[in-house]
Design a protein with these regions (language model features):
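Generic beta-sheet signal
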Residues: 3-4, 46, 133-143
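A short, acidic, amphipathic alpha-helical segment used as a generic capping/interface helix at domain edges
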Residues: 120-133
């Protein structure tokens, strides 16, 4: 199977660089760059999956794709309620913030996320395990989810930008 991983389109600037997990935000259509997805529009996919959150579905619809399956397992990691929607500077100002949380990825994740790393990974592995073999598959999801998926599949990339897409061949 071949997977093409696509990060959803950009949100309104006010939500950029914020911890936007399960908050159901819309994309900003004025920031949709058709050039970034021009090749994807021409490609034939056997199956297309999307996070159930609006920003992913709107991204596919802006690409004139309306035949896709939503799956909540493709959501971004769930942030704690007091973190959701904040940027890093705002998080630093919280009474609960401690600089020590920045010392390890595990400590930072435990501080900002309501979902453990293990639960997040299990959710994504569960989705991947159910994908049919020998298919061309497009997955539209969120930055953190796609990064975790790439790590699970042995593909390392530190960041995936809005509308960036990465193809991974020979996924077993």
């Amino acid at each position: 199977m071949a997977l093409t991983l696509l990060r959803h389109a950009a949100l309104a600037k006010e939500y950029e660089n914020c911890y936007n997990g399960w908050k159901d935000l819309s994309i900003d259509p004025s920031r949709f760059d058709d050039r970034k997805v021009a090749l994807l529009r021409k490609q034939k996919f056997d199956l297309i999956y999307s996070s159930d959150l609006l920003r992913c579905q709107q991204t596919l619809e802006m690409m004139d794709i309306d035949d896709y399956v939503t799956d909540e397992r493709l959501r971004e990691v769930r942030f704690k309620e007091e973190i959701e929607g904040l940027n890093f500077h705002q998080v630093e100002q919280l009474d609960s913030f401690r600089a020590a949380y920045l010392e390890t990825r595990e400590a930072w994740h435990a501080y900002i996320c309501a979902e453990s790393q293990e639960a997040f990974e299990r959710r994504i592995r569960s989705f991947l395990s159910e994908l049919p073999q020998n298919k061309e598959i497009l997955i539209c999801s969120h930055g953190g989810t796609l990064q975790k998926m790439m790590t699970i599949l042995g593909y390392t990339k530190n960041k995936i930008d809005y509308l960036e897409h990465i193809r991974i061949d020979n996924v077993i």
